[in-house]
Amino acid sequence: YFQHWLDMEDKIKNLPKIFNVNWFRLDDNGKFIWPGFGDNFRVLQWILKRCNGEVDAVESPIGYLPHPEDICLDGLDDFTTEDVADLLSVDIDVWEEEIADIEEHYKKFDRLPQELTDQLAAMKERFAKLK
């Protein structure tokens, strides 16, 4: 199954862009950081702008992230660019735990494509360079 999707690179001229969103990050008080629901369009708006080359991104160990000021906050009185920056922060310890969990998950597969383990190893290395 994994290999089928990896092989698409050779079969499709214009591959789709892939984005990952965690709508459920919590702050130090256990509350959701992102307002959610109807405000999700703000992130989707950034994704469309990114795909159209209208906005840039910041490189991180987990991929490219929006500049906080590129997320439209019009009409959100209780949500600031600083809140967006907090939401976009990459917690090294959390991600190292995530990588360890993924490594354990990968052990369940007997025919896992090498490309997946290579990508995970590369991400692990990017985090190691930050320490």
Regions found by a protein language model. Give the residues of each.
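Flexible, glycine-rich loop/tail regions that form catalytic "lids" or insertion modules at the edges
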Residues: 1-131
